[in-house]
Every structure is written in C-alpha cells, then in structure tokens.
Amino acid sequence: MALNIKDPEVDRLAAELADRLHTSKTAAIRHALSAQLAFLESRAGDREAQLLDILRTEIWPLLADRSPITKLEREQILGYDPATGV
C-alpha cells in the first residue's frame, strides 16, 4: 500500500529523520509512528493511575464514610432518570 506525501514540510521532516537514523524515509516514518503510538499508549496508563490517585487523595476522603459513591448515588446527584434515560 502506497503513502503519497504531498506536504513539503512533512517530506522534509521525513528526510531529516531518515538522515539522522541512517535509514530510508519509509523506515523513518515507521519508526516515528511506532514511537508516537507507544508514547500515547504509555500515557493512557499514566492518566488512569493519576485519576485514581486524585480520587483516593482528594475526592474519597471528603465522603462521609470514605468510600466511593455508588452508581445510583451518582445518578441521583446528576438528576438522571433511569426510566427516561435523561
């Protein structure tokens, strides 16, 4: 499957990366895309851990019994009506 790069700046960046990696543009683009996907995947896990940490340290201690609220309690707070779905 072919990839046709029409943007001169993207072509220049691909050429520069290929030159620095001593490889072809195709290999450089593959490397860059794989690295970006790995970075995004690693951040997704970090984000989940950060959110749980905030819940543990900032939110849950404010609750009377120090436990997370239930789904039903969340729905009541938001005014959600399960019968209508709104």
UniProtKB/Swiss-Prot annotation:
Superkingdom of this protein's organism: Bacteria
Keyword terms of this UniProt record: Toxin-antitoxin system
Cited function: Possibly the antitoxin component of a type II toxin-antitoxin (TA) system. Its cognate toxin is VapC36 (Potential).
Protein name (Swiss-Prot/TrEMBL): Putative antitoxin VapB36
Gene: vapB36
